[in-house]
Amino acid sequence: MTMRTATITEFSSSYRSLPGLLHLLQFGDSALPIGGFSFSNGLESAIQQNLVHDKETLREFTLTAMNQAATSDGIALLTAHRAARADDRGALQVIDKAVFERKLNEETRLMTVRMGRKLCELSASIIDDRLNRDWLECIKTAETPGTHPVSLGLAFVALDVDGRDAFGAQQYGVATTILGAALRLMRVSFMDTQKILLEATSTVAPAYEEIADAGIEDMASFAPMVDILAAVHVKGHVRMFMN
């Protein structure tokens, strides 16, 4: 039997990629303390209106939400990632405002700026990076809204995570936010949500290829049902989630 001996170069390459993988796990974790657990991405209203009522409709809702996020926040994340690499502060502010303006209802605007600010506060505290610290000051002084995809892009650039992997973490976060909320809102098992998650993650690579070279002008957030559900949720009498 022939034993293959790994070269020093192969080990070095493996070690170089490991920190990036761990950073993805940390910042893609739904338990990251930026308030994501307070939001359901519209699922609560969808369940109340009986649009989501079983594992199949939950699957459809999750895949639709991920697709919508890819062409809106996903593009914003990638353009912010490129701008941060170039240290283009002006472009970052343009992207940030474009994201905020495309959130048509109060709850989605609240979600993106609350999570964006919390993420930037976290990044500025634990990552030694001037751009993240400066961006936090811009948020505090109301120079920029501080949306979540822009803050996420800045954090991943500081951690030397590439755009494709950053997009993957963002998409994973959308799916786990919805599926985590589903476990608290409806009769569905962990097996069901994990099966949906496994299928959902298989759509991320093709979604990335479709928007990899998109610019901020290509952002599209056409999702009328989500906006209607958010409007219904604002006036809801019984609410577990903030959106």
From Swiss-Prot:
Name of the protein this chain belongs to: Urease accessory protein UreF 2
GO MF term list: nickel cation binding
Subunit record text: UreD, UreF and UreG form a complex that acts as a GTP-hydrolysis-dependent molecular chaperone, activating the urease apoprotein by helping to assemble the nickel containing metallocenter of UreC. The UreE protein probably delivers the nickel.
Compartment(s): Cytoplasm
GO CC terms, sorted: cytoplasm
Gene3D superfamilies in alphabetical order: Urease accessory protein UreF
InterPro entries noted in UniProt: UreF, UreF_sf
Physiological role: Required for maturation of urease via the functional incorporation of the urease nickel metallocenter.
Keyword Nucleotide-binding among UniProt keywords: no
Domain of life: Bacteria
Keyword Chaperone: yes
Family membership: Belongs to the UreF family.
Keywords: Chaperone, Cytoplasm, Nickel insertion
